[in-house]
């Protein structure tokens, strides 16, 4: 996906392929299983992957918000995941690695299978705390300025945030 606007109002799997590349655009999807899924296709012999370099993506899924049977890489854009409330799935689910080297990630979901990015070139904040549906979640710097703000449409217990605006050695508060 290189640009444009995609709005998937209901589906089993929002976007699914052996390789999912998002280089721009505005994507909003609602899935009753996985939101974005890179699945194994033994016919191709290639490792499944999800690559995000730009764009604004919102994945609201009852299953895994982002699910790769291989790798995930994010170098730009904004990815907001409203993942499962069931502990059988996670907001982020990957088998090999999740390289976070740019962009902004907000991943909210259940705690049971919670994963955060595995390789980071920017700070990541992981919080495990119950938050009710309809709550506004804000991450603020030491000066009280919002760095990240979102409203969760469903209950969550795992909150994962990463952005280049997080500075190493700085203090942040979550409200």
Predicted regions and their residues:
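A composition-driven surface/loop motif
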Residues: 1-175
């Amino acid at each position: 996906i290189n640009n444009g606007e995609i709005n998937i109002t209901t589906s089993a799997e929002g976007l699914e392929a052996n390789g999912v590349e998002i280089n721009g655009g505005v994507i909003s999807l609602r899935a009753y299983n996985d939101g974005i899924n890179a699945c194994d296709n033994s016919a191709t012999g290639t490792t499944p992957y999800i690559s995000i370099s730009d764009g604004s993506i919102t994945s609201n899924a009852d299953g895994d918000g982002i699910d790769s049977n291989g790798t995930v890489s994010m170098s730009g854009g904004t990815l907001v995941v409203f993942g499962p409330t069931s502990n059988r799935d996670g907001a982020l689910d990957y088998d090999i690695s999740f390289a976070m080297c740019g962009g902004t990630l907000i991943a909210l979901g259940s705690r049971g299978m919670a994963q955060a990015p595995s390789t980071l070139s920017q700070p990541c904040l992981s919080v495990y705390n119950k938050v009710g549906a309809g709550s506004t979640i804000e991450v603020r710097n030491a000066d009280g300025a919002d760095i990240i703000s979102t409203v969760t449409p469903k209950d969550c217990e795992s909150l994962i945030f990463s952005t280049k605006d997080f500075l190493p050695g700085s203090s942040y508060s979550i409200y």
